[in-house]
Amino acid sequence: MSKEKFERVKPHVNVGTIGHVDHGKTTLTAAICTTLAKVYGGAARDFASIDNAPEERERGITIATSHVEYDTPTRHYAHVDCPGHADYVKNMITGAAQMDGGILVVAATDGPMPQTREHILLGRQVGIPYIIVFMNKCDMVDDEELLELVEMEVRELLSEYDFPGDDLPVIQGSALGALNGEEQWEAKIVELAEALDSYIPEPERAVDMPFLMPIEDVFSIQGRGTVVTGRIERGILNVGDEVAIVGIKDTTTTTCTGVEMFRKLLDEGRAGENVGALLRGTKRDEVERGQVLAKPGSITPHTKFESEVYVLSKDEGGRHTPFFKGYRPQFYFRTTDVTGDISLPEGVEMVMPGDNIQMQVELIAPIAMDEGLRFAIREGGRTVGAGVVAKIFD
């Protein structure tokens, strides 16, 4: 029993395979599970069970994703793999599978291909902080110089998108070789696992980040003042803390004089909890749904940003027709809709359902945001797109 308890405190890290179609992402996923189970213990998963990915719905978008888990001596990994290119695009944009690091799979026989580039760009846009490269199918390349050339190309491509191409780990291996139990290639999988352990830092836990709570509801309580309710997204709210009310209107600051949960008074509320916060001297009409309560100075309101957007297909309940510049939908951030104007990249006249696109947005009211914030695009209450804030313009 004590072993079980010990396992649970291992740091938990989310990773995933990205890269061009048929470069071996799913084979590598199976090879990692199988090899690490053999070396460190744990459950092996075969190719077929991973490739047969169940479809999930995230905000109404259908995404096929396989989730596997594996352990190294120091960490527990949750790993996502998608069968199709479109699934990757949707996954990365919706944040359905948040990644603390990505494993970019590049076949040594092909070198970088169009989707290699697209996945690196998406990784940059949606904020995947670390990338490790696994050069696959190296058993099919006899020429050492060719391997070096491919590695150089991949490193240059990563540098082009602001990843540290010169410094990040590149492992040359063969996923199939490792799956077939060939020792030299199994060793490369262990090397990849060691690179994950050493190169991807332990993610900061939500509770350790600066306090933020999206406001869902506002009540005034006779004789006590104004209470705002919501689910704490990150950090801790202590009674007596100074808090900022950010978004929609000018930012104001007040003091939290009470925290309650299920009508019980608490000393603090923590990330993941639904609480009510009593605000000193704040009137009922000074706060509204869509604003956030946050540690002062930790987040600022903005109206203009660049985003990466996936437009739902007709089958997913999205639009049946394309949209053009001048389109003015609602952008749903956390708890509220705000109208915004879009501008499309140069040379793009229209956007079709099922496309993914970079677009600049200008909202009619400011929203508390930082890069990496997810949103939905809605028309009359139905979701027609999903996006992520890639870059904020002041």
Curated annotation (Swiss-Prot):
Q: Show the GO cellular component annotation of the record.
A: cytosol
- Alphabetically list the UniProt keywords: Cytoplasm, Elongation factor, GTP-binding, Hydrolase, Magnesium, Metal-binding, Nucleotide-binding, Protein biosynthesis
Region annotated G5 sits at 174-176
Could you say which protein family the record assigns here?
Answer: Belongs to the TRAFAC class translation factor GTPase superfamily. Classic translation factor GTPase family. EF-Tu/EF-1A subfamily.
**Stretches the record annotates as G2:** 60-64
Instruction: Check the record and name the Pfam families matching this protein.
Output: GTP_EFTU (PF00009), GTP_EFTU_D2 (PF03144), GTP_EFTU_D3 (PF03143)
- Stated name of the protein: Elongation factor Tu
Q: Which NCBIfam families match?
A: EF-Tu, PRK00049.1, PRK12735.1, PRK12736.1, small_GTP
Q: What does this protein do?
A: GTP hydrolase that promotes the GTP-dependent binding of aminoacyl-tRNA to the A-site of ribosomes during protein biosynthesis.
Species assigned in the record: Vibrio campbellii (strain ATCC BAA-1116)
Q: Name one GO molecular function term.
A: guanosine tetraphosphate binding
Q: Which gene encodes it?
A: tuf1
Q: Tell me which InterPro entries the record gives.
A: EF-Tu_GTP-bd, EF-Tu_GTPase, EFTu-like_2, EFTU_2, G_TR_CS, P-loop_NTPase, Small_GTP-bd, T_Tr_GTP-bd_dom
